[in-house]
Amino acid sequence: MVQRLKTLYLESAVLKLQETFGYKNPHQIPRIKKIVINCGLSEASQNSKSLESAMKELSIIAGQKGVITRAKKAIAGFKIREGLPIGICITLRGDSMYAFLDRLINLALPRIRDFQGVSSKSFDGHGNYNLGLKEQLMFPEIDYDQIDKIRGMDICIVTNAKTDSEGFYLLEVLGMPFKEKFAN
């Protein structure tokens, strides 16, 4: 089954991007390569149940199992030893990536209280977009009664766009609700 957002990209976004930026080769047209969902857990080193709970919630949201990230080196100030679990990371590609992005844009983001749009200033200089969410409850798959703690997550949308303006236009054509227009 072809995802709705992938169809939108192939049928209209490619033409709009080609027309706007004047690409001659179809391989120059920006596309989304992957989406990385990251959740840092400060309490994971003391409480293994919180790690399991967060893993379950992120797996429900993303549709695939995550990888536990471990501390690379010890930091005494944070009471972290080398090898302790400190977070969860999920990388989405292909149809699952488009399905997640579709749910994020059309279901999750509009459920945020007082939502006016996402910032257009979160591009990294190479066309990739980073978004931080304060709670996982905005996703309809998560039930309020089933969670033990409200956790946030970082979402990184990686594109092969050369500039931020190309990445902005790609996400805008796909329906990302930006607060303001992109300014260099």
Curated annotation (Swiss-Prot):
Main localization of the protein described in the UniProt heading: plastid
GO biological process, one term: translation
Keywords, sorted A to Z: Chloroplast, Plastid, Ribonucleoprotein, Ribosomal protein, RNA-binding, rRNA-binding
Subcellular location per the Swiss-Prot or TrEMBL entry: Plastid, Chloroplast
Keyword NAD attributed: no
PROSITE patterns found in the cross-reference section: RIBOSOMAL_L5
InterPro entries xrefs: Ribosomal_uL5, Ribosomal_uL5_bac-type, Ribosomal_uL5_C, Ribosomal_uL5_CS, Ribosomal_uL5_dom_sf, Ribosomal_uL5_N
Gene Ontology CC annotations of this record: chloroplast; ribonucleoprotein complex; ribosome
Recorded GO MF terms: rRNA binding; structural constituent of ribosome
Domain of life assignment: Eukaryota
A Pfam family annotated for this UniProt entry: Ribosomal_L5
HAMAP family named in the record: Ribosomal_uL5_B
Known role: Binds 5S rRNA, forms part of the central protuberance of the 50S subunit.
Complex formation: Part of the 50S ribosomal subunit; contacts the 5S rRNA.
Family recorded in the similarity comment: Belongs to the universal ribosomal protein uL5 family.
Protein name: Large ribosomal subunit protein uL5c
Gene: rpl5
